[in-house]
Every structure is written in structure tokens, then in C-alpha cells.
């Protein structure tokens, strides 16, 4: 959910700490590669640990929901390293406290619901099937950016939406796909619906978050993005805790921990690892925005959607059906269209800067 507009890139560079400005080229590349590793690996690991939790006897959907945002205090570390921006303070004076609270509460509630749907989807689906379906978020991105953020839908974006939609439909109709929990076809369809609907909500909240920065807060800096991530995650975590107690799942946690096949220590480490990996992915995304650009960060995040289903097949030996073998290349083609369109947009921005500099 970390989206920063390219035309603001130069202005944000002025807030880069002097420590980064003193980096030589090799040090800069090391930090970039570390950030890429954090982003791709963390997103894949969080999905794999979530599937591992269910495979080994975990059954709490609300605990799985909580770990997706519960590690948000980690984000205070990178936030403390950033300088206080003038735009952040000016936006606070121009935007009422009630407006900020409303934004954090509404987006945080949406994130909490979104994470719950992701948890239900992962419960009923194999990790590879789940990851392929979650790639549909790119298709929804194009639609919401057009209607909410007034961004054009080019031919490449149209074909990206088309290919990703076809891939999602094929996977959802795959009769040979195995449900990891051995549930019925009905449960499999529920998992597919939850994964796709969660991707829709995720894309919607990205567009609404960018809309909030542009139209309400009137500014967008790295500090503000991290603050938005922290406070919305806090609200989403509260939603998960309320759901945990309201559903009565909290009473079964001690039994679940005792019956976890790999033992209580692994149970705790699995949940902690999932929570930490979710936040490390966020740190990696912010770092790439900081070191390179928002476009590059979004592209690497897109590439992680390709890595995750492949990692799931390798780790959990998910059933690679004929339909899935067709759906994955179609989804990858949709990724390619999406990435190439972003490359063209970035090229256009670079040329405009060069022309303005001359």
C-alpha cells in the first residue's frame, strides 16, 4: 500500500538524510539489493508461513488475520530514522484531526476485513493457487486507478487486466486442484472467492489511500506513508483482536498450540515469523522508494507475486494441474504487460524532466 507519485520524486529527494547522500555507488547497490531481498522474500515467506500454520494444525482465521498487521511497531524504527518533513507538519495544520482519524479508521477497518478474507482464502486453498488468484489485484488496480485516481487505461493495462482475469477464472474453475485441508469443492470455491474479493479490497484501499494523500492531506512524503501504514495497521490489528474474542477463537488457542504438530515453540515462531515478514516487506518497499523510486518499488512488489506461487510449489509440493500450468503463464504475461506499461510511464517522466532541465 505504499504508493508515491513519480512527479514528486525530486521534491522528496531533498528530505533524504545526509548519510544516504554520502553513500558511494557500491554501498548504494548493496542497500538496493538488501531492500529487494526483503521485499520479495518477506512477501513470499509470509504466505508460506501462513500456509504452514494451517497445514500443521492451526485453524484460527483471526490469529492469521492479526499477524498480517500485528508487527506494525517494527515500522517505528525506519520512521525514527527519517527527518520530520515540513509537508507532514503543514498537512497536519490544514487537515483537521477528525479527518485524519476518519481516514485511519476507515482504511484500517478495510485492511482488517481484507486481511480476514486473505486468511480464509489461504485456509481453503493451496499456497500456489492462492498466490495466482491474488495476482488479480493488478487487474483491479487498473480499474480503480481509472475511476478514482483518473489514470488512463492503456492497451497494455487492458490486456494485463484481461490476462490476469482469465488466469483467475481458470484457477477457480479447476476441478483437479487439491484443497490442502481436504475440504469439499464448495470450500474451494469459497477460498477462491475470498482471495479474489480480498484482492479487490486491497486494490481499492490503495487507490483510496493515494486519493487521501492527493486530495485530503495535500502532500505525500516517506514519513507520512509510514505513519499511514502504522496507524491503519493499528486499527486493523484492533479489528482482528475484536474478531478473535467475538468469535470465541481465543478460547481454543491454548488447545491449538498444544496440538500443533511441530510443537508449541514452532507454533509461536511461525506466528512471530509471519508478523515480522509482513512488516519487513513494508520496510523493503519503503527503502526502495527511498533509494530508487516509487515505480521501482511497485515493480519489485509485482515481481514478488510471480515468485510466491513458484516457491509454494517447491516448498509444499502443491499439485501442478494442467489448468494451473496454463493459468500461470497467462498470469505472467499479464505481469509483463503491467511492468512494461510502468516502464513506458517512467520513461515518459524521465524525458519530461530532461526537457525541463534543458
Curated annotation (Swiss-Prot):
Task: Tell me the disulfide pairings in this chain.
Answer: none
Q: Which GO terms describe its cellular component?
A: membrane
Q: How does it sit in the membrane?
A: Multi-pass membrane protein
Q: Does the keyword Transmembrane helix apply?
A: yes
Which cell locations does it reside in?
Answer: Membrane
Q: Name one GO molecular function term.
A: purine nucleobase transmembrane transporter activity
Entry keywords, A to Z: Membrane, Transmembrane, Transmembrane helix, Transport
One biological process term in Gene Ontology: purine nucleobase transport
| InterPro entries, A to Z | PUP_plant (IPR030182)
Residues spanning the membrane:
29-49, 62-82, 100-120, 128-148, 153-173, 189-209, 235-255, 280-299, 300-316, 320-340
Q: Which family does it belong to?
A: Belongs to the purine permeases (TC 2.A.7.14) family.
The protein's name in its UniProt record? Putative purine permease 12
Q: Where does this protein come from, organism-wise? A: Arabidopsis thaliana (Mouse-ear cress)
Q: What is the lineage of its organism?
A: Eukaryota, Viridiplantae, Streptophyta, Embryophyta, Tracheophyta
Gene label: PUP12
Amino acid at each position: 500500500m505504499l504508493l508515491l507519485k513519480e512527479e514528486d520524486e525530486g521534491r522528496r529527494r531533498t528530505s533524504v538524510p545526509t548519510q544516504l547522500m554520502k553513500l558511494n555507488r557500491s554501498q548504494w547497490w548493496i542497500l538496493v539489493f538488501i531492500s529487494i531481498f526483503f521485499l520479495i522474500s518477506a512477501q513470499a515467506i509470509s504466505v508460506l508461513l501462513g500456509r504452514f500454520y494451517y497445514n500443521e494444525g492451526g485453524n484460527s482465521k483471526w490469529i492469521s488475520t492479526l499477524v498480517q498487521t500485528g508487527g506494525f511497531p517494527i515500522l517505528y524504527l525506519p520512521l525514527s530514522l527519517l527527518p520530520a518533513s515540513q509537508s507532514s507538519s503543514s498537512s497536519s495544520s490544514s487537515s483537521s484531526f477528525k479527518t485524519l482519524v476518519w481516514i485511519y479508521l476507515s482504511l484500517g477497518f478495510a485492511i482488517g476485513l481484507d486481511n480476514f478474507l486473505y486468511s480464509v482464502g489461504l485456509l481453503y486453498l493451496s499456497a500456489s493457487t492462492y498466490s495466482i488468484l491474488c495476482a488479480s489485484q493488478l487487474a483491479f488496480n487498473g480499474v480503480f486507478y481509472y475511476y478514482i485516481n483518473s489514470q488512463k487505461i492503456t492497451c497494455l493495462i487492458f490486456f494485463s487486466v484481461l490476462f490476469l482475469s482469465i488466469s483467475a477464472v481458470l484457477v477457480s474453475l479447476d476441478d483437479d486442484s487439491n484443497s490442502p485441508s481436504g475440504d469439499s469443492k464448495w470450500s474451494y470455491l469459497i477460498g477462491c472467492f475470498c482471495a479474489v474479493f480480498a484482492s479487490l479490497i486491497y486494490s481499492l484501499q490503495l487507490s483510496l489511500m493515494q486519493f487521501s494523500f492527493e486530495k485530503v492531506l495535500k502532500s505525500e512524503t516517506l514519513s507520512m506513508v509510514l505513519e499511514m501504514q502504522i496507524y491503519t495497521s493499528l486499527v486493523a490489528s484492533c479489528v482482528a483482536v475484536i474478531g478473535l474474542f467475538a468469535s470465541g477463537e481465543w478460547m481454543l488457542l491454548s488447545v491449538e498450540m498444544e496440538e500443533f504438530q511441530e510443537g508449541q515453540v514452532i507454533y509461536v515462531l511461525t506466528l512471530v515469523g509471519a508478523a515480522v515478514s509482513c512488516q519487513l516487506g513494508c520496510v523493503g518497499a519503503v527503502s526502495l522508494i527511498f533509494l530508487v523510486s516509487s515505480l521501482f518499488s511497485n515493480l519489485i512488489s509485482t515481481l514478488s507475486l510471480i515468485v510466491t506461487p513458484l516457491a509454494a510449489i517447491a516448498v509444499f509440493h502443491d499439485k501442478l494441474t494442467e489448468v494451473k500450468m496454463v493459468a500461470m503463464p497467462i498470469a505472467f504475461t499479464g505481469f509483463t504487460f503491467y511492468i512494461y506499461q510502468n516502464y513506458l510511464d517512467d520513461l515518459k517522466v524521465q524525458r519530461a524532466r530532461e526537457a525541463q532541465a534543458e
